[in-house]
Amino acid sequence: MAVVIRLRREGKKGRPQYRIVVADKRCPTNGKYIEEVGFYDPMVEAPQGYRLKLQRVSYWLKQGAKPTETVDQIIKKVSKLETKDN
């Protein structure tokens, strides 16, 4: 099973919000998913616009899940913010 970490769109028209989910590559974008690992609101500035379970993301990456380009950028931003806080 090919697993990807991708965005799942929610919200209103003109006011998008995204859930970061782990899903089978063959499932539709807004279809069934395995696990929700985060949240992204593009209308809110960082760091409030991102919420990510980094432990679960790293688990899925070790299992072979491939993040999309956008999710990969979000993971890098959040991990940079986490290391800056500590």
Swiss-Prot record:
The keyword Repeat does not apply. One of its GO terms (cellular component) is small ribosomal subunit. One of its GO terms (biological process) is translation. The keyword Ribosomal protein applies. Keywords: Ribonucleoprotein, Ribosomal protein. It comes from the Bacteria. One of its GO terms (molecular function) is structural constituent of ribosome. InterPro entries: Ribosomal_bS16, Ribosomal_bS16_dom_sf. Pfam families: Ribosomal_S16. HAMAP family: Ribosomal_bS16. Belongs to the bacterial ribosomal protein bS16 family. This is Small ribosomal subunit protein bS16. It comes from Methylacidiphilum infernorum (isolate V4) (Methylokorus infernorum (strain V4)).
